[in-house]
Each structure stands twice: as C-alpha cells, then as structure tokens.
From Swiss-Prot:
This is RNA-splicing ligase RtcB homolog. It comes from the Eukaryota. Keywords: GTP-binding, Ligase, Manganese, Metal-binding, Nucleotide-binding, tRNA processing. The lineage of its organism: Eukaryota, Sar, Alveolata, Apicomplexa, Aconoidasida. The active site is at H438. SUPFAM superfamilies: Hypothetical protein PH1602.
C-alpha cells in the first residue's frame, strides 16, 4: 500500500538549490519508484502557485494530479536520465504536466516513449513573421487587416480548410512536411531554413496513421482550430499582430531581421489539429493494452507508454513524426494566407513587405537528440511537452543564419499580454536538456474563468490597450483573458535569470484572432 504523506511532510522532499537560481529539487521518495530527481525552475511567486495546488490536492484529492506530482511520476518512468524537468510555466496536464521535459536513454532496452509526454496536439507550435512595416503604417487600416485575416484563416472547432487536398496529398504532407508546402506553392523555399528540423521529420510514416486520423486531418489544413486540448488545459490557438516594444539584444534581434521599436510582426500558434489528436488517442489505446504484456509499472495510468523499440513504440514515433509534418504544413499554409491578407489590404507584395519567417518552434514533440549525461555523450529520446527547444550558439542542429546567436525561441503570451523572442544558451544544455519555457501557463480553468471574469470588462480592458479582437466563440474572451494565466513576463524573466534562455525582443499585441 502506498504511503500517504501530509502536505508538510511532502515539503521535506523539496529543497531549493544553493547553486542554481530559481531551481527547486524534488528528491526521490516524493512519490514511489522515482529513478531520478525532479527539477522545478520557478521563482518564489511561481513556485507558490504550484505548492498551493499541491496543498489543495493533499487536503482534498480530486480527479486531477497537481503538476508537482506529475513531475515526480515522470521521474519514475523506466530509462529516464538526468531529471524530470518542469519549467516556470508548468501546470497540470494529461500524464505529464504541461511544461515538462524528460529524456530516455536510447541504449537502455527498458526506456519508454509516452504519448502523454508529447500531448494530444502533436507539434503544437509557434511561427513568427516579421515585416518592414511600422505600427503607424497599419494603424489606420488595422481593423480592415484583422478582419481580412479572420476571413481568410478558418478558426474554431470543426472549421474547414480552404486548401484543396485529397488523400494522396495528405500522405505526401505527412511524409514530406514543409517540402510539400514548398513544392505546392504555399511556402517560400527559404521558410523551412528557419524552422525547427527544417519543417520535416524524416522518420514519418503515413501508413501507420489511421484512416480515422487522416479523415479528421483532410479538411483542416491551414486552419487555426481551437484551444481545447482533450484532458488538458492549454493556451488557446491564435494568430496575432504584434509590434516590437523592446529590444534587449540588438545584435541577435538584427540577425533575425528585427531592428526597430514599433516594427510589425505576426505570430501564429497552431498544431496538428484533429489528426494529431487521433494519432495520440490511437497510440494510448495501443499502449494501455500492452502495459501488462510489457510489465511496465507506472504511477499513473495516464502515463501509458511502451518500450521505445517495441512495435507500439516504433509505430507511435512514426505516427507522431507524420503528425508533426502535418503541423508544419498547417502553419505554412496559414503563413501563405497571412501574406495574402497583407497583400490584399496593403496592395504590396509579401516580398516587398519583407514578410519573412523569423523562426518556427515546436512545443509538443518527442525527438532523438545527443546530450551529455554524467560526462558521456548519450543518444536520448527527448519528450518536450509545453516546452521549447533552446539550443545554444554553434549547435549543429540550428540554422546557419543563427549559428552565432543561438536558436530563436518564441514564447507566446495571452490575449492581452506581451510575447517574447528569446535565444538558447549553453546553460540550457547543461540544466534543462536544451529546453526553456513556451508560454505563460494557466492558473484558472476555462470553466472558472467563465464564472469569475466579466465578458464586457475583459473586452473593455483590451480596447483600452488598443487591441483589436476577433474570436471564433464569445466564451474565449473570458477563457483566454490575461487573468486566467501566469504572468508571461515573470516566466520569461525566471528563465533568463536561471540562464536557460536569454531575452531578445518583447512584442506587444495590437490585434488578436482566437480560435
């Protein structure tokens, strides 16, 4: 029988690091069977939110596990190395917390892959476009511009894409990713040079993706979708217009083509839609059925998993890669539609408007990477869920354009708050397996947001800030209000102070499209 600890007793397993700023260490014994420690990166204010969640659960256990328990349960999975890592935007999710990073040794035959460590919206991620426009150039036509974007980019649950696509096209999308969108005219050839993995995972195999998943994905190419992730509470999906408010690192920003306060940028956040959700759901069924056969013990049934080299593990990784390719194409088509919207309203070509991709990052993905573990270079399967790769300067897997500055990291804020561009660091490789935060992280559930926040008050606050808004559903106004989230600036500053990413640019929203 598992021993039950009081809240005060559980705190004895958590200590603050003397060596690394904003690091809390969760020692073995916090939950049963931990193979490694849990490492939480959070300042005192952000950590208090997670401790309060833990206390609430201890006093009154509910249907969800607090993020700290989930972090520790991941530390008990077979084959995990270094530590189970939670970033400052961590909050409770399905199996893994959102904001969790975990790596498994590819040379260990017991190591596992878990769909809960990626999430249901496989390769949900963010793409940033820059322009040569200043805010004064679009201010008189801002409403027209945001309406054109809203008209061209399908948003919301069940929305249908405008790109003609048959099952043959879909298989090519799943296999070739952005190479398909370049050949089909929906991407500029240079776009993929500024995408993580250059917009394609070569392990993808369309034949392992179920007919049901393909049917769901066929009509959703180039759609923004909605932000309700099954079994989890994540940031909503959006396409926002920003202006540069502050530049912290002028050299790095200039390399990215961002060099002026007031410069207009566009950020799109979306993923693999219903197709990725179905790939994850199918894999969970397979893995739940095989858990007894493989004799893998997990602390939480939501951590259903399979050995990496098992049939179930290989199938999931191939399907996840295919869904990731789909997500890159999805963001590419939305980039195409965004460029088209600007062209139609401003009567200039996207090329003349300098609408180049700054970068495209993944927030929910599993990848094979090489990292140092106990002084040895090891090949690992990295699970990043609600977290962002943050490789340092001169890392071989980042684009040539960014070798001197490190990988750009895109961190989205909420409906009325700023977003950030960061750069990766060597310390991230040492402390967080080359990872940093991805957003702000929810503090209120969607239901609670609708109960306690006033629709008109939220709209008025946005209006006072000069933010235009279009939403697929009115309920999103309260669900996605800034009050529902942690302070993204505090999250970003915590990562900056810990040295796992470096602040580069701050972006202020002037128009918001929510799905």
């Amino acid at each position: 029988m598992t021993k039950t600890y009081k809240y005060e007793d559980q705190l004895h397993f958590i200590q603050k690091s003397d060596d690394v700023k904003n690091l809390f260490i969760i020692k073995k014994g916090f939950v049963p069977n931990m193979n490694v420690e849990g490492h939480l990166f959070a300042n005192d204010n952000l950590s208090k939110l997670l401790f309060d969640e833990l206390k609430q659960f201890t006093d009154d256990p509910g249907s969800f596990l607090p993020a700290l328990k989930q972090l520790a349960n991941v530390a008990a999975l077979p084959g995990i190395v270094k530590s189970s890592i939670a970033l400052p935007d961590a909050h409770s999710g399905y199996g893994f917390s959102i904001g969790n990073v975990a790596a498994f040794d590819m040379d260990n035959c017991n190591s596992i892959v878990s769909p809960g460590g990626v999430g249901f919206d496989i390769n949900c991620g963010v793409r940033l476009l820059r322009t040569n426009l200043l805010y004064k150039d679009i201010e008189p036509i801002k409403e027209q511009l945001v309406q054109k974007l809203f008209d061209l980019i399908p948003v919301g649950v069940g929305c249908q894409g405008k790109i003609p696509c048959d099952y043959g096209d879909l298989d090519n999308i799943l296999e070739y990713g952005m190479d398909w969108s370049v050949c089909s005219g929906y991407s500029w050839a240079e776009d993929k040079e500024h995408c993580e993995d250059f917009g394609r995972m070569i392990q993808a195999d369309p034949t392992v993706v179920s007919y049901r998943a393909k049917k769901r994905g066929l009509s959703q190419i180039g759609t923004l979708g909605a932000g309700n992730h099954y079994g989890e509470v994540q940031v909503s999906i959006y396409s926002n217009i920003y202006v540069v408010e502050e530049i912290y690192d002028e050299y790095s920003a200039k390399v990215m083509g961002i060099d002026r306060i007031g410069q207009v940028c566009i950020m799109t956040h979306s993923g693999s839609r219903g197709l990725g959700h179905q790939v994850a759901s199918d894999a969970l069924v397979d893995m739940e059925n095989s858990l007894n056969k493989s004799k893998i013990k997990v602390n939480d049934k939501q951590l259903a998993c399979a050995r990496i080299n098992s049939d179930e593990g290989k199938k999931y990784l191939k399907g996840m890669a295919a869904a990731s390719n789909y997500a890159w194409v999805n963001r590419s088509v939305m980039t195409h539609l965004t460029r088209k919207a600007f062209e139609e309203v401003l009567k200039e070509s996207a090329d003349d408007l300098d609408m180049h991709v700054v970068y495209d990052v993944s927030h929910n993905i599993a990848k094979i990477e090489d990292h140092m573990v106990d002084g040895k270079l090891k090949r690992l399967l990295l699970h990043r869920k609600g977290s962002t790769r943050a490789f340092p300067p001169y890392h071989p897997l980042i684009s040539a354009d960014f070798q001197h500055i490190g990988q750009p990291v895109l961190v989205g804020g909420t409906m009325g708050t700023c977003s950030y561009v960061l750069t990766g660091t060597q310390l991230a490789m040492d402390l967080t397996l080359g990872s940093t935060c991805h957003g702000s992280g929810r503090t209120l559930s969607r239901n609670k947001s609708r109960r306690v926040l006033d629709y008109n008050e939220v709209l008025n606050n946005l209006k006072e800030k000069g933010i235009s808004i279009r939403v697929a559903s009115p309920k999103l106004v309260t669900e996605e209000a800034p009050e529902s989230y942690k302070d993204v600036s505090e999250v970003v500053q915590t990562c900056h102070d810990s040295g796992i990413s470096k602040k580069c640019v701050k972006l202020r929203p002037v128009a918001v499209i929510k799905g």
